[in-house]
Amino acid sequence: MDPQVVNLLQETEEDVYRRKTARIRRKVSEIEKECEMYAVKIYNVERDIQRYRHEAQLLSKVLEKKGLNKEKEAGET
């Protein structure tokens, strides 16, 4: 008989449990790392969105002021 087959036949329930839990722990660890990576990406995107909104507000205010100044200049002449 093949040595691997003999080894599997001699494997106890405890060995099977240990092997399966080790595999599950590895998978959980991989998924946790992926979650951390996505959390960082989401944080960076949210920060970028806030920055772009702030820049858009500032630009809007600047354009409003320039628009009002042009209207005042046109009214004075």
UniProtKB/Swiss-Prot annotation:
Biological processes per GO annotation: chromatin remodeling; transcription initiation-coupled chromatin remodeling
InterPro entries, A to Z: INO80F
Keyword Cytoplasm: yes
First-listed, main subcellular location of the protein, grouped into a coarse class: cytoplasm
Gene Ontology CC entries for this record: cytosol; Ino80 complex; nucleus
Compartment list: Cytoplasm; Nucleus
Keyword RNA-binding: no
Keywords in alphabetical order: Cytoplasm, Nucleus
Pfam family, one: INO80F
Official protein name in the record: Uncharacterized protein C16C4.20c
